[in-house]
Structures are given as C-alpha cells and as structure tokens.
Amino acid sequence: NSLLCSKDGLMWLGMLGGGVCTVNTNKFRFNYDSLEALREHCPTSSVRSVYQEDNGNLWMGIMGFGLVFYDMEQHTIVPYRSHPVLKNMGYTSTVNDIIYRKRTNELCFATWDDGVWFYNVKAGKAHVVNTVTNPELSDICIYSLLEDSKGNLWLGTRSGVFILDTEQRLHSLNELVTLTNQALPQISIFKMAEDQDGFIGIATSNEGVRRIDT
C-alpha cells in the first residue's frame, strides 16, 4: 500500500492486510512488525502511508482510523485524536500521503476527508487547508503531495491538481498552465514527482502520465 526507504537503508512496506514489513537491503533480512500496539486502539493495522522522522519514529495513515504516531523505541501508539496538537483537527478516515515541507518546516498530511493538514513539530502548531479555509479547493480528498524545487506544494486531489505557492496562495493547475493541452480534466491524481529539469510528472487515474513544464 505504501513504500518508504528510511535514512538507515531500511525499506518499509505498509500493507493493506495489516502491519509494516521492513527489509534490510544491506543484509537481505526481513523484519515484520504486526503493530500489536496499534491494535490496542483500533481493530486493524492496515497502513495506507508512512513517514519516518529523523529520530526514527513513524507517522502512519491507518485505513479507517486516520493518523497515528508510532514511537519505535517504546513501541507505543498515539492516535491523532489523542495527540496534544492534532486532536483539534477535523475528522479523517485515513491519510493517503505524508511528506515534510522544507520551506515551512512542516509535516504535511494528505487526508481523505479534510484536505491537507500542516504540523510544525518544533512550534507545536497545526493548521489545515480544506474547502472551508480555501473555497477554491474543489475536493477535500487528497491523494498525493509534492514540494517542488521552488518551494511550492502540489496537491494531487480526487478532482485534479492544486498548487499552494510560497505566499500560501492556492491555485488550480488549470489556472496556471499556458498551453491548453496541458490542462487536466477533473480526475484523481495518485502520484507526482519532479525531475532534474524541473518538469512535474503526474500519474492520473485514467489519463496516463502527464508532464508539466513549470
């Protein structure tokens, strides 16, 4: 369901059936964490997305139960509803993607039901971009996130692409493209990536891969 290569060379596999599998690519050894600590809070361990902090702790999107923080040393789970900062955020059934935005020093969570959550860990502050705060956003279901080389945040939604610029202004991609053949229909955007030349590749639900010249 999700893949992450952590800084220590481990591959983390979030599995739809439950739990996390780790692969040691240096020693070709597999480790499996069934996330029993998670099952104390909810009757599933189906991992939709995963992000590792510098200290090794994990943030995970859990199918049907939103977001959790996993302390790797203590093997303890903190659901977002019990988190001292994130407990004030809205409801979400899961988190589809998690990235760190360098420009603003924030963790960004692509939620299924509430747009994008932003969490500055050092400042202890969180805020949201959704259809209430930004009516120009046409869909609250966010599948993917990308911070480009200019510091803009790209939002891949169920209804196309939106861009949060460095001034925190939100635009739809179709407002910004200069060529009509680069405009996107209202379709799901599953993944985005930037190449070394600054082009953005966009994986769509049924329109193949689009390449956008920024």
Task: Pin down the residues of each PLM region.
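Carboxylate-rich, polar loop motifs that coordinate divalent cations or form catalytic acidic clusters
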Residues: N1-T214
